[in-house]
């Protein structure tokens, strides 16, 4: 790699660290099959990428954006948040064949519901206990 090429690139991208990142990204793009904008002249991809940057034949802001996207670990997507109330409504729609416990028909059909008239069969008064004691004395 010629020193002249790097010095020409520093005029386009003053920060040498950023130059290395951008030139590396362009070299990876060339390896992936991107079209060359200068003649190869039997040079390797990093040298070709530096020559392209020095000549100004590549779009440097696009290369910088590609570097940023390549280094990102987590891409945050703005999605609307659902309320708990909306999620409950969705649960009902997702289970059309399953009856929910909140339905009155389901509560009556389960056989475990105590109705108002069911208590009348039981005699819970105190005289019921006395009748059994009197029967024992006889």
Curated annotation (Swiss-Prot):
Q: Which GO terms describe its biological process?
A: DNA-templated transcription
Sorted alphabetically, which keywords does the UniProt record give? DNA-directed RNA polymerase, Nucleotidyltransferase, Transcription, Transferase
Compositional bias, Acidic residues, is annotated for 119-138
Q: Which Gene3D superfamilies match?
A: 3.90.940.10
Q: Which reaction does it catalyse?
A: RNA(n) + a ribonucleoside 5'-triphosphate = RNA(n+1) + diphosphate
Q: Name one GO molecular function term.
A: DNA-directed RNA polymerase activity
Give EC number(s), comma-separated. Answer: 2.7.7.6
Entry's SMART domains? RNA_pol_Rpb6
GO cellular component terms attached to this protein's record: DNA-directed RNA polymerase complex
Using the UniProt annotation, give all residue ranges assigned to the region (Disordered). 101-138
Q: What does this protein do?
A: Promotes RNA polymerase assembly. Latches the N- and C-terminal regions of the beta' subunit thereby facilitating its interaction with the beta and alpha subunits.
The UniProt similarity line reads: Belongs to the RNA polymerase subunit omega family.
Quaternary data: The RNAP catalytic core consists of 2 alpha, 1 beta, 1 beta' and 1 omega subunit. When a sigma factor is associated with the core the holoenzyme is formed, which can initiate transcription.
| Record-given protein name | DNA-directed RNA polymerase subunit omega
Q: What is the species listed in this Swiss-Prot or TrEMBL entry?
A: Rhodospirillum rubrum (strain ATCC 11170 / ATH 1.1.1 / DSM 467 / LMG 4362 / NCIMB 8255 / S1)
């Amino acid at each position: 790699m010629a020193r002249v090429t790097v010095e020409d690139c520093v005029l386009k991208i003053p920060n040498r660290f950023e130059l290395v990142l951008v030139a590396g990204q362009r070299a990876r793009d060339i390896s992936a099959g991107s079209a060359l904008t200068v003649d190869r002249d039997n040079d390797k991809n990093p040298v070709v990428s530096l020559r392209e940057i020095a000549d100004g034949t590549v779009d440097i802001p696009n290369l910088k954006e590609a570097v940023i996207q390549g280094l990102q670990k987590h891409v945050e997507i703005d999605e609307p948040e659902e309320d708990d109330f909306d999620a409950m409504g969705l649960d009902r729609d997702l289970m059309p064949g399953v009856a929910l416990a909140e339905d009155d028909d389901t509560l009556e059909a389960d056989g475990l519901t105590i109705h108002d008239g069911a208590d009348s069969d039981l005699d819970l008064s105190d005289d019921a206990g006395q009748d059994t004691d009197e029967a024992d004395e006889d």
